[in-house]
Amino acid sequence: KNKIALLGGQPIQDSPLKPYNTISNVEIKKANEVLNTGQLSGYIAAPGENFLGGKWTKKLEEDFCRKFEIKYSVTVNSATSALHAALIAAGVGEDDEVITSPYTMAASATTAVMCGAKPIFVDIETDYFCLDVEKVKKAISPKTKAIMAVNIFGQAANLKKLRKIADEKNIILIEDNAQAPGAKFHNIYTGTIGHMGIFSLNRHKTIQTGEGGVIVTNSQCLANRCRLVRNHGEAVIPETNEFNGHEDIIGYNYRLTELQSAIAIPQLRRLEKLNKQRQELASFLFEEISKFN
């Protein structure tokens, strides 16, 4: 019998497959609109309306709120930045503990370390590969400050039970929803059941702008803290654009550009279509692979 390519046989495909392209002419048109203005970022780290970014960034945040039926959204330059900002907003710091899944991308754990905290790994359940709720209960200690539930491969953790546990223990529940945009748990969008949820705009995610991330929450306080983290921790009260007189949080440059925001807006509008395409590709692979013994 012929050897498979992995073992030295002749490959069926002798050149790399073309990357899957989700950028349409609409995104190209929007990107050109921004390029023609010459204003590729709308941020200023000072009091004023531009502390919260430019018009495209604000429009993307409005669209995220509308799409996922949530009060506040905060764009940042990556989902890793979003996880870090959310943990800071939750008050996670030195010697705290953050419960999370070991079955995830590294940032779900390393962002806790970036805050000076310790990631506590809790095993996953076997049906959806998400945090096992009963094991989460056993892992909670007086040092537990947050639970980071990872919704992986489009599947949701048992978010209602995790939220109930978090509320009872006065712990913040953060959803790492990078791999499940548009998924629902009991008819509620994943990413919106926890105190905060994280979305990714990385190039291989469903909605992509090359790099980027979004934090969503129903808490004005948490949203404002994330905004401060995003823009150097400048002491600005966003609602009134008045100088606050003191800094109460250390911030970074986690700002998303106008160009990225303009590309993300039409991508978000096509979320259902993009998810359906991925589901069709997955179904095809499952069907073909099942033919092998």
Label every PLM stretch briefly.
Residues 1-80, 84-88, 93, 167:
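Conserved PLP-binding active-site segment in aminotransferase class I/II-type PLP enzymes
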Residues 30-31, 64, 82, 98, ...:
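Generic structural signal for small/hydrophobic residues in well-ordered secondary structure
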Residues 69, 85, 101, 207-211:
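Conserved beta-strand->loop/alpha-helix structural units within folded catalytic cores of enzymes
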Residues 82-87, 108, 112, 213, ...:
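Buried hydrophobic packing segments
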Residues 88-177, 184:
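PLP-dependent aminotransferase-like
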Residues 180-186, 193-293:
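Active-site region of PLP-dependent enzymes
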